[in-house]
């Protein structure tokens, strides 16, 4: 996947081509490729993938086809599921209040219950993180309006949170640099 980005390929078309076994890709097929890259990259499963296609583009596929597509992604990019598994170790370290390092050149530090320390000194935290042996899942307390709700967290979600946090740091830095010369009005995602 990194090579595709480096070569400035349209990774959505490349994924769709792998999924459908075709070189000429329609707009709808590219959307399937895009949804696969963006969702499966953070460990989206077949059920959610099927629902996402239906909700966002009125594309109806059966669960068997959704599973085939998700499995195709995981076979094409086996290092990504390996990354999710390594991120599960982050959850274990937080839950057990242990220090560990993560990422290329160990750029991210996990400081026990404090969470994942980002390069700018901010933290990604999962309040009251705990492991539920009955389900085999990690859960944490998430604020939803005025309520606190239990929310699942897993390796793929941790990777998504890290990617979003690092992107925010980069955009913030760029805004500071731009603001030295121009007035910043807003950002668009």
What do these predicted regions represent?
Residues 1-189:
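Conserved catalytic core of nucleotide polymerization and phosphodiester-bond processing enzymes
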